[in-house]
Structure formats: C-alpha cells, structure tokens
From Swiss-Prot:
PANTHER family: TRNA MODIFICATION GTPASE GTPBP3 (PTHR42714), TRNA MODIFICATION GTPASE GTPBP3, MITOCHONDRIAL (PTHR42714:SF2). The gene is mnmE. Mg(2+) binds at S238, T259. GO terms for biological process: tRNA methylation; tRNA wobble uridine modification. Its EC number is 3.6.-.-. This is tRNA modification GTPase MnmE.
Amino acid sequence: MKEFDTIAAIATALGEGGIAIIRVSGNKALEIVNKIFRGINGKDLLDIKPYTMRYGHMIDENNEIIDEVIVSFMKGPRSFTAEDTVEINCHGGIVATNKVLQNVIKAGARLAEPGEFTKRAFLNGRIDLSQAEAVMDIITAKTELSMKSAMTQSQGRLSTEINNLRKEALDILALIEYAVDFTEDDEEPDETIPVKVKEDVITLRGKVNNLIDTADEGKLIRDGLSMVIVGKPNVGKSSLLNALLNEKRAIVTDIAGTTRDVIEEYINLDGIPVRLVDTAGIRETEDVVEKIGVEKSKEKINEADLVILMLDTSRELDEEDKEIIDYIKDRKYIVLLNKVDLDRKLSSEIVDNLENKIELSAKTGFGIDDLKSKIKDLFFNGSIDAESVMVTNTRHKEALYRASENLDGALNGLNNNEFLDLVSIYVTSALRALGEITGAELEEDLVNKIFAEFCCGK
C-alpha cells in the first residue's frame, strides 16, 4: 500500500551548508539504507541499536564512496512518523545531498510527497491534524512569539480543548438519545431533560464562542499584522519605515513623490510579526508611474489591518490631507503627527477630532516606542500571551463558526419546543465541525490537500 511503503526526502533546506539530512521512513528504512552504507571497520546497520548513530560512508552501485556520513536510527513507534526512521547526516550542498538521496531511491525507497512524513505521523495516530498543521507553523514562524504559539498548538493544547468540547457534545447527544428512547417506550417523558439539554447547549456554545474570540489575535500572531503607512508625499513615511527597520530601506529626500511604488518589509514588533507597507503618497498626479503607485496605495489601505496616517506638523492641513483622512476614517488607524522637532504650524479641528494621535519625529526616533505601545493596545489590549490556547488557523476558525451556528440552531429548536431528535441533528453537525479541527471528522481529499501545502521532507 502506497501510504506505508518506505519514503525518503531531504529534510533540511537545500543549499550550501555544513550538514544536510536525508530522512527515510517505513518498515524497510534500515534495510534500504544499509544497502548503500559502509561502516568503519566493515560494520553495517542491521545490528545498530535504536536511538544511536553510526559513522561511515555512502556508496553507489559501483562501491565508490559518495560521501562521509553519520546515520541515526529511530525505531517505530517512537519516531516522528511512528515508523522505523533512518536519518542520514551528510555534507551540505546541492550536489552531495541530491547524490545521496538518489542512491537511497535507487536502493528501494520512494521520493516522499510534500508533507508526507507529517501525514504519516497523523495517519499513524501520533499527532492529530491541528498538531500536524502546527509543525508547518513552527517552520514558517517569523518571530519568537509566533513560534511559541505554534509550539503550544503542536503540544496538543488546542487539541485537548477541542476534544473536551466534543465530549460535551457527545454527552448532550447521549442525554437526547435517552429521552427519545424513553418516549418510544410509551413512558412518561422526563420534563427536566429538555431543560438540561438547553443548559448544556448554551454552555457548550459559550465555550466555542470563547475560542472564536481568540481567532483575530491568533491570526495576527501566526500570520502577522498588515500595517500601511499613508500620507502626502514627503510627509516622512519613508523615514518612519527606516526608523522601524533600523536600516535605510526607503529613499529619503526632500523631493515630493520619491516613493513611487509600494515598499513592503517584515519587522518584529516586540514579538508580533508586522508586514509593514510604505506606500506612495495619495494625491492627484499626471505622472503615469506615480499614478500607478497611488492606486496600489489605495489597494493596500483596503487590505490592511491597521493604517498609519502621517501628518506633517510643520505645515497647515490642506485639501489633500483632508482627502486622505476621509479615505481612512472608517478603518482602524493611528495618526502620527510627524516632525515635532520643527516649528509647529498644524492646527485643525479635523485633526483634533481624530483618535489615536501620537506625536513623533521619524527623523530622531522620538515617539516610536509610543507607536509600538499603541499598536499592542489596539490589537492585544496591551499584552500578548502566546502560551494560552488560541485559534491561529483560518480552517479552525471556520470549523468553530459552523459548530457555533449549529448550536444556535439547536437552541432555536429547543426554544420552539421542537422534537429532541431534530435538535440532535444540529448537535451532531456541531460535533462533526469540531472533529474537523483535529481530523477526527474529515474527508480524505481535504486531508491530502492540507498536507500537500507542506514542504518536502516534512
């Protein structure tokens, strides 16, 4: 069966480096690698003890040495895949690594599909689906905070929470089944059961909704905050970008319209991954290139989680500033009153009525810390706890929404005195939606799609 043949792939990033690892997993892993291994003093791998390493050489079909290696062996089920696993530590480098992999495949292994090692760990019951997805989140984490959140999920904290919710749903279904059986036996129904079912549904729905409430914060920790810097040309947007990056990334001149395109960078904002977008100024222009930049700026504003509006305090507000303010007023924003190190000329009732204003000098760095604090206040209530259970995955959030909607349906049925067996249909649907998060209830095609998004060797 394809799922349980022996697979192999490069587990480390392909490129020049000191060491690369080829991972081989399956019940013939040791036998296959042994065919192309020659140990020092003639030792092979068939007598290697689990969780030990052996030094030697990889050889080809002509018994010529390919590379100097150290081979480790993990006996299933105490391995990542829960299968016998061999890892070949060879020299890094594209040629050497691929040569070793090619010979492993010639010896009888199959090249692994993307995510197939993690998929086997899931299919073999070592981890559930949410833990498997956390593995990829650890790999792609952009900050220590996002990695810590992914580690929490990989250790099964979210899985435990979901399994507890599923148990509560099963308890509700058992209670309904008891009541329905009671009625079918022509016995007098217990009038307290619908009341108890309603109480339990309300409690379960509350817990599901509490998890949903963590999703926005969780998504920001996992994927990052999209933040757009917007304002008139030469207001100091590029200087702010450089101040946040601590390097000269954007061109800073006194010529209006210098930033003609959208500049994007990732920064680590006290553990929060932030995708920072420095836009071209928004203004009417006849310059074709600059006009394209202005349109891109508007697109980025519409996509952003947060808009940073920069105003120049060294001059009066003009019509162009007012147009920008009007464009972003219905979005989550912070107003930066820049160039406070210069003589102040800005005075406007429109500005006075704006929220979340911060005075700063992008040139000197004054006010940057206040900006960082304000961002955390707006999105994380001033503090971030990446170790608490939270929903970071859009797929999980959608499943929780479906569970909540079905529990709403169950509650409406109970309020309308519908038959309990009809109410149970909604509760069963909620149970299945929760099961999709851990993989307890999921179609095979969707499982394959999830793992296909993983990188090779993982």
